[in-house]
Amino acid sequence: MKTKRFWGFIKDPIFGYIHLTETEKKILDTLPLQRLRRIRQVAGSEYVYPSANHTRLEHSLGVMHLAGLLAENLPVNLQEDDIQSCRIAGLCHDVGHGPFSHVFEHILEKYYHQTHEDLTEWLIRESEISDVIRAEGFEPDRIGKLAVGKLKDREKPYLNQIIRSAVDSDKMDFLLRDSYHTGAEYGRVDIFRLIYTMDVLDNNLAVNLTALPTLEAFVIARVEAFRTIYFHRTGRAAQVMLARALEKAKEAGELEFKTVEDYLDLDDYTVWASLKKCPKCKHIVDALERRQLLKCCYERAFYVKDQLITSLLTDEGFRSNVAERIALKSNLNPEEVIIDVPSLPSVPYHLAQTRAMDIPLFSKTQDGRKIPRKVTDLSQIIEVLQGFMNIIRVYTKEKYREKVMTAAEEVLGRMPVSTEVSY
C-alpha cells in the first residue's frame, strides 16, 4: 500500500508473508470470516487429491493480497482508501459461500433464488462485518458491491475488475492455490508479470501486449486445471453425491436459514453432522465415508462456440429426460442415473463464466500512447480455446455400470477414444 500501516503478517505457502492492516485484522477476526476456516475450497477433490483440504479462508487472504498488489501497481492515481477498499473486498469476497462451497450453490439457487454472491453482499451489509467496516471509515454497501464486481463507480469502473473479471485477483489465487494443494501443478503461471503489466484502457483493466505469452499460459492453465481438478470425473462423483445428499436433506426440512445467524451456523462440519443424522441421506454420507463413490460409465467431451448448447445441457428438464431414457433402457429407477455437465451451479470455475477473448490488450507507442489490440487477432492459442469446453457424463452405482453404459451409448452415441484420457 502507499502508506504501509500494517498490523502484522501471516505466513502463506503461496505468497510467503501476507501483511494485514489493523482494519483487515479486525475484519478477519469476525465470525463470517472465521467461518471460512470450516468451508473447504474445492470440496470433493480430496477424494482424488488427499491434500486438497485447504479452505476459503486462506484463499480469501490470497485474494486480498493480490487485489492490493494489482490496485497499487496500476499506473493511475488511486488513493490509499481505494487500495484499502480493494483489499477489504478481496478479503470478504467469499463470505457468502455455503457448506462445501460450490456444491451448495444448487440449494441456494433452487430454494432461495440466490447465489453465493448475493449472500456475500448480504453478510457484508448485515453481519458484524458491517460494524467493523463502518467504524473504520468505509461504507459496507460499497464494499459489498465491490466484492462481487457490481460497484457502479463512473470514475473508476475498473475497480470491479480487480476482484471480478477474466483475469482477476480471485482467479489468480485459486489457480495457484488449488494447483499447489492438489499437486496437479498446472497453476505454475507468472501471475506477477500480469499484475505488473496491467493498465487501464478506456476505463477497463487491460494487459500489455508484452505479457501475451504469460496471458496465454494463464488461459491454458485454467483449461487444464478445470479438466484435472474442478471437473475431474472422480471428484465430481463425490460432489454429485454431496449435492444429492443436500437436496434430500433440504426436502426433509434441513438447511433452513432466515437470518444472518442461521446462515453462519451452516458450514462443512455442522452440515455433515446433519446429513449423517438425516434418514433420507444418511446412506449417501455412509458411502462417502467409505469412498464408495458413484462410477462414471459414459463421457463425451466437445467444444462449442454456441452458448445455446451450453444452456441446453444445463437445463434440468433436458437432463432429467436423458436420465429417464437411459434408466428405461437399463430397466432401472431414474434415481439411479445421474447426468452431469460442467455448467451446473455446483461446478466451480466453469470456463464459460469468463471468456479469455474478452480480455483487453494494448500496445504502447514510443510516445507512451496506448493502442487497443484484439486478443484473438494476436493469439492463435486463445482463439482456439474460445469455444466453451463441455463434458456430458453419466454416473451410476458400480453394480449398474455395464448396463447403464450400454444404454447411455444408445441414447447419447458411442464414447470417443478421448474418454480414456485420465482426467
Task: Annotate each predicted stretch with a short phrase.
Residues 1-85, 95-423:
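Histidine-centered, transition-metal-coordinating active-site segments
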Residues 90-91:
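Elongated alpha-helical scaffolds
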